[in-house]
Amino acid sequence: MKKFTIADFSIYKTQTKKITMITAYDFNHAQLIAESLIDTILVGDSLGMVVQGSNNTLNVSLNDILYHTKAVRCGAPDKFIVADMPYLSYHLDSKTTIQNAGTLICAGGADAVKLEINNVNMLSQISSLTDAQIPVIAHIGMTPQSVNVFGGFKVQGKNTEQVQHIEKMAQLAQDAGASAIVIECVPSSVAQKITETLLIPTIGIGAGNCCDGQVLVLNDLLGMSKHTPKFAKQYLDGKS
């Protein structure tokens, strides 16, 4: 099967083909996904919760993501892999951001990196990375690295101010050079409007079924998570 590439994000959007993305953190699960029709794998900082057992993603380090990205690449050599940039790995300056992203690409084997964008100050990092020829996926809405600012993992876009902010971040992320945008935990109407407005594809998680694709945490689907989100269909009871 032909490997999904960064160019396919826009091609799928044009052809109205749904993009499929799922998380993986180790060699064995990556092998299973490698044999499936899933388009892309996300090595997410969600590993802090589903692998390391933390209450949030803030403790995940660049070395953690690098380690797991290497393992996933070994298990899925022909899959498109997106590596999360963990908290504080892209918040300091452009030089550090490029170095950290470059490590995930060159040493980890990732094809692209994902950044959570919750304010305009983060947009310059997208531009810096794309200028360095590193593909970027932006992440808006309920951005888990902002959990302490939100006061918990709460749905975003429930009032006019939040909706306008999310829509603005989506447009500016596209303008900065993002190849796609993950939209997490916002009302489906908000995600639908953004999807219809942008030229780049949207990938939803807990954002309804109107996005150009969906991403889910593998552990949720297998019933292995402590708390499975309502939007995640559970195919197995991995805890039994």
Predicted ranges, named:
Residues K2-S240:
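Alpha/beta enzyme core
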